[in-house]
Design a protein with these regions (language model features):
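Non-catalytic terminal accessory segments
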Residues: 1-121
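Membrane-embedded segments
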Residues: 118-124, 129-148
Length: 148
């Protein structure tokens, strides 16, 4: 296989683990349940194959679309919060119960904020005038659009 094909597949595999699996493995370990290497490999492979199928086929299956896009959102937020808690735990002595509490006290409000913020799209109309512009021109500038 060519490198142009292999590199995106490797990136998707790493992405699948870091976004979908790793944060929840860490949370699981904080709850006292460690995951085996076999569980990690199987769950990462499952997520990888679902994401690969979705991105390659552009499937319109609502369940797969929900799994991929909502999973990316929840997983990314979880990854950043878990990473932040792990960094803090190197500096301060925090037990597992406190880590779980910090995670949920941060995660739930951020998810609620993100949900409501996504529903509130802002539209601004700007008018420019200049002596060198003779024709009336209209254009649209779309910024930070996540189509899904």
């Amino acid at each position: 296989m060519r490198l142009q094909v292999i590199i995106p597949l490797i990136i998707l595999l790493i992405f699948s683990y870091l976004i979908f699996i790793f944060p929840f493995e860490v949370i699981s370990s904080w709850l006292g349940r460690s995951t085996s290497l076999q569980e990690t490999i199987l769950s990462t492979a499952f997520v990888y194959l679902v994401c690969l199928y979705y991105f390659r086929s552009k499937s319109s299956n609502k369940i797969i679309k929900l799994f991929v896009y909502e999973g990316i959102g929840i997983g990314t937020l979880s990854l950043f919060i878990v990473f932040f808690i792990l960094l803090i735990s190197f500096i301060l002595n925090i037990n597992e119960a406190q880590k779980i509490f910090i995670f949920f006290i941060t995660f739930i409000p951020l998810i609620i904020y993100g949900f409501f913020n996504a529903k509130n799209v802002s539209v601004k109309q700007l008018k420019f005038s200049h002596s060198k512009i003779k024709k009336k021109i209209k254009f649209i500038f779309l910024s930070d659009i996540h189509i899904g």
